[in-house]
Amino acid sequence: MPSLKNAKSDVKRNKKKPVIITTHNFPKANAAAVKVLNKYGSSMDAAEAACMAVEADEKNSNAGIGSLPDENGRVTLDSCVMDSNGNCGSVAFLQNIVHPVSVARKVMDDTKHVMLVGKGAKKFAVSKGFRHTNLLTKDSRNAWMKWQKNRVEMTPHDTHDTCATLIQDHNGNISGACTTGGWAYKMHGRVGDSPLIGSGLFIDNNVGGAAATGLGEEVIKSSGSFLVVELMRQGYDPVSACTEALNRIISSYNGNPDFQICYIAISKDGEVGAACLKWSFPHLITKSGITKLKSVKGLLS
């Protein structure tokens, strides 16, 4: 009969080394996730922690407090989470709450629903103890006032970097999360792909996961993240799956889309990859506790 000490050693040997891939250059996100994983926390806990770190950073204008507002000067936030069991939660058009990713987690864990929006999402958040907070910082307000002078339409490539993260934990389970302030100076009420399961994020623990950033309207049209995962199910590796999903968009625009979309993906084996339409796409990968900033060149660059 094996000793308890040997049994514990066997468990450690059977554990996987966690893997993290996050859109853009959000080092605080990966660092927060690593802290959770170092304590053998779940991929879902790590993904939530990653997004919370970005949401709490006032100097970041892309998510949480300090996000650039809509055309009316109001900060509206979107987020979603999906775990290794296929459970998911989402909030959209949420105002005055710093951590929409945690509200999305509460929707998943504490309700029978998947998505809450607007005033209903805010009421739910407050009922769960989240505090009403002014999200419009001095910097984001000044940027909005400057934009007001000419009201030139901005593009997501100019102003908007969604934080999306995909994580595989020590048990081999994959979860993901997205959080964003959305398209800067958008129409009041606009919601993009980030809170939509299958568009901004999708996880199938038997296959892998994918997430998106860029022009959300175009990601929604193609159910982008779901498509990437389905391509991996068919045998594509993460990079090839992201590339094929983008090639379908390129084809639908006669080879010349005038916007940016980027995908990240992770396979059940812990392999990660990314691809983008234009320019370049920075992203962070953490393996064996070491985080490296990577960049891929756009397919049309």
Q: Predicted regions span which residues?
A:
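Alpha/propeptide regions of enzymes that mature by internal proteolysis
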Residues: P2-S301
